[in-house]
Amino acid sequence: MSASNSFETALLGLIITNVDAANVGDAAGLQNSATAGVFWISLTVSPGHTEAGDQTTNETAYTNYARQDEARNTTQWTVTNDTADNDNAIGFPTGGASGATLFGFGLGSDTSGAGNLFIIGDLTATLAVSSGITPSFAAGALDVVCA
């Protein structure tokens, strides 16, 4: 089963930027949230991902690590075709005494703990975090693809 390109774009717009997905059911379509809220972005230490689990599944625990929030709006994200990209850099805390090798990312519901994990993906290259290393996604580098 597959969705059309236009529906993939509409779904990403609704989920990532809180923009209505028009013409689903009626002209108004699937409506946005009254309050857009944020996604909490996490970093993971395991290659590949499982669709089971929560935000803590394979989440890194390097010294000083914390999830970072990103608003669900068109100021923070751009949706083009089947891909959503971050419009601004997303920085994480600088590594401390204990490090980790990062393989992936997640978008979820909670600032900490076992929140809902909505979207998972792999980094384009692994990143070894140690003391003084600051993980980040440059603007346009975090791709969420609906294909």
What are these regions (language model features)?
Residues 1-104, 109-147:
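Small cysteine-rich, disulfide-bonded extracellular modules of the LU/uPAR three-finger superfamily
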